[in-house]
């Protein structure tokens, strides 16, 4: 399942974040890549623990845990602290699959990467190229969203960032360990939750609503890992 989550940040917030990122001291993006990924990765990144990365990451997490679309689709258990990257002219990240487990720097906590996400901080017209290209059961999708918008997709997906040929592409990326490991089960629960919410709006007194809600929670009980 690939999901577009709009307006996690408002435009004025994005502008302030981008201005701060433009003034930041960036490091080689290979610092967080695995052995295979490092050979394919050509970008810049704020080091883990960088004050600006921590500030932006905390603001992102605050919004994510309050976002109904993210909560319904991801069913989050743990979220890896968001990282920040920058692609300038010539920057790219060839096809790869994210590591299955990530460990934040200085932490004993481990996060299984069930879901990957990218939050865009540059407007599409500010750079050429730089599309996030994702291959999975839903086919091949090229994603280049407005600043402040986010895309959520399975961590098992083969994906790349196409070369930037003009401008700069600022973004955040992170991973989520879901309460439900299997993507097809999460997709089913997401569809069911959406149907329940729509039915609640259209026919709040319908007798089937309680039964459908009960079925949703019984499926959660069967599939959730805590």
Swiss-Prot record:
Tell me the GO molecular function terms.
2-oxoglutarate-dependent dioxygenase activity; iron ion binding; L-ascorbic acid binding
Query: Which residues does 2-oxoglutarate bind?
Result: 169
Q: Which cofactor is recorded for it?
A: Fe(2+); L-ascorbate
Q: Which PROSITE patterns match?
A: FE2OG_OXY
Q: Which UniProt keywords apply?
A: Dioxygenase, Iron, Metal-binding, Oxidoreductase, Vitamin C
A Gene Ontology biological process in which this protein takes part is: DNA damage response
Q: Which domain of life is it from?
A: Bacteria
Cross-referenced SMART domains, in alphabetical order? P4Hc
According to the entry, every stretch annotated as the Fe2OG dioxygenase domain falls at: 78-178
Which sites bind Fe cation? 96, 98, 159
Database matches in HAMAP family: Hydroxyl_YbiX (MF_00657)
Matching entries from NCBIfam families are given as: PRK05467.1-3, PRK05467.1-4
Q: What is this protein called?
A: PKHD-type hydroxylase Pfl01_0799
